[in-house]
Every structure is written in structure tokens, then in C-alpha cells.
Amino acid sequence: WIMGHMVNAIAQIDEFVNLGANSIETDVSFDKNANPEYTYHGIPCGCGRTCTKSEKFNVFLQGLQKATTPGDSKYQEKLVLVVFDLKSSSLYDNQASDAGKKLAKSLLQNYWKNGNNGGRAYIVLSIPNLAHYKLITGFKETLKTEGHPELMEKVGYDFFGNDDIDQVAKAYKKAGVTGHVWQSDGITNCLPRGLDRVKQAVANRDSSNGFINKVYYWTVDKRSTTRGALDAGVDGIMTNYPDVIADVLSESAYKSKFRIATYEDNPWETFKN
């Protein structure tokens, strides 16, 4: 999965997919009542990018729905996965459940169209703080109460705080999560970061008793870093330059080992060679 970083305006969806992304990451900011408000990152946001593009969250979801609904004039067949980078650090820990409930309602109405031919992309809820695990339970409860528990088949999870992997496992246990787990590791593209924790996450993914299904590394803009991440065995790379990642994937060392994921590739299944 080539994951376009910080896609917060509807116009950027086409821009990133046309450069080779089959997945996008979108920032979600919350108001003080835990309502998802804008797709907005804010300053600072990494090197070489404008940090302030934004839409109202529900408006962005409507644009995203069109981009991921077959038959729509805006449909982008290649876009199969969306990571919502939830900026829930602005909330109190005890608001996490409310944030999850309100996020589920927004998605249900504006993206899934209440289960009536909505967008088809898989969704990853990416959470900054292990203490916010109730965001997951609130989200799940709401889809159930609203009569659409089947949509949870389209939803996965990620904690992106670079926490100790054993601690991440405990948070999922509390949230009652037993699958659909993506594990991110990374740092802003302005700074270097080693691959030690990525390798730990990959080892967990590939062990018989691991809880991780997929591992992705962020934010990668250089060919050399891309090669390092691929050599470590990641499933996804988040980038400001999807074309750079696509280029490296076409190199002879990688093209027989990796391919670009399509809608038929289940993002919740651990890949077995």
C-alpha cells in the first residue's frame, strides 16, 4: 500500500492517486465536544508541505465517498484504503468514547450513506494515544446501535504513538480488538529514524501468536529509506511522493517480491509467502 500523506482537501485525492497512491492518510481534528470537525493538520506538518489545507470533515467524507464508489464520475478504482489520523490528543481521555461515537455517525451518514451504496474503501482508525482505546469501543457500539454492525468488516485500527509493542497489545485487549490491526512506526520526514521498531512489529506480524496484521512506515520521501523499509518487510509506506515509492517498487530487486495492493487484497489478512 502506497499511502499518500496528509490528504486533507478533496482536490488532493485525485492528485495523490494519479501519482500512484492506492491509499491516503487524512487528518481529523475534533472540536472541544469531541465532534470530528475538519480534515486539518496544522503547523508544523513535515518538510516541504503546506500544512493548512482543509475541508469540513463531513464535506471531505462526501468527496471521498464519490472517489470510492464504482460508477461515480469521480471514482478512482485504485484507491482502496483510507487512514484517518485522528488528532484526539486535543481531547480529554474521558472524551475518547464520545469521539468514536461521533466519528461513526459521521462516517455512516456521509461516507457509507447509511449502508446504501456508500464508499467501498477500507478504513483504518489511527489513534495517537493508547489511553484513547475507548474511541474504538464507542465507534463499534454506535455502528451496532445504528443497525450496521456489518460495516465493522471495513474498519481496522492503528496506534501511531510509537509505543512499546507489548503496551499496544494491552490496549487492544481492553478495546476487545482481535484482528484488523495495522501497526505504524515512524517520524516526520524532517528527521531520520532507525528501523528497529519496524523490525519488531514485522516479527510480531510474522510470529504464530502475534496480534499485528500489517506494518507501515511513515513518512518516507527518499529512495534509500524506501528500500530500507521494503527490506524490513513492511506492508505499507506513507509518503509525500507516491511516485518515488512506485519507482522503487519497479526496481528489479523489488518487483518480484512486492506489488501494489488492489481492492481484492484484504488489508486485515496477514500476508503469507
Curated annotation (Swiss-Prot):
| Domain of life assignment | Eukaryota
- What is the catalytic activity of this protein? an N-(acyl)-sphingosylphosphocholine = an N-(acyl)-sphingosyl-1,3-cyclic phosphate + choline; an N-(acyl)-sphingosylphosphoethanolamine = an N-(acyl)-sphingosyl-1,3-cyclic phosphate + ethanolamine; a 1-acyl-sn-glycero-3-phosphocholine = a 1-acyl-sn-glycero-2,3-cyclic phosphate + choline; a 1-acyl-sn-glycero-3-phosphoethanolamine = a 1-acyl-sn-glycero-2,3-cyclic phosphate + ethanolamine
**What does the entry comment about cofactor binding?**
Binds 1 Mg(2+) ion per subunit.
Q: Which residues form the active site?
A: 5, 41 (nucleophile)
- Disulfide links within the chain: 45-51, 47-190
Residues binding Mg(2+) are 25, 27, 85
> Which terms are listed as keywords in the entry?
Cytolysis, Dermonecrotic toxin, Disulfide bond, Hemolysis, Lipid degradation, Lipid metabolism, Lyase, Magnesium, Metal-binding, Secreted, Toxin
**Which metal ions or organic cofactors does this protein require, according to UniProt?**
Mg(2+)
> EC class of this enzyme?
lyase
Which tissues does the record link to its expression? Expressed by the venom gland.
Q: Where in the cell is it found?
A: Secreted
MF GO annotations: lyase activity; metal ion binding; phosphoric diester hydrolase activity; toxin activity
Q: Which Pfam families match?
A: GDPD_2
What family is it from? Belongs to the arthropod phospholipase D family. Class II subfamily.
Q: What does this protein do?
A: Dermonecrotic toxins cleave the phosphodiester linkage between the phosphate and headgroup of certain phospholipids (sphingolipid and lysolipid substrates), forming an alcohol (often choline) and a cyclic phosphate. This toxin acts on sphingomyelin (SM). It may also act on ceramide phosphoethanolamine (CPE), lysophosphatidylcholine (LPC) and lysophosphatidylethanolamine (LPE), but not on lysophosphatidylserine (LPS), and lysophosphatidylglycerol (LPG). It acts by transphosphatidylation, releasing exclusively cyclic phosphate products as second products.
Question: What's the protein here called?
Answer: Dermonecrotic toxin LdSicTox-alphaIB3aiv
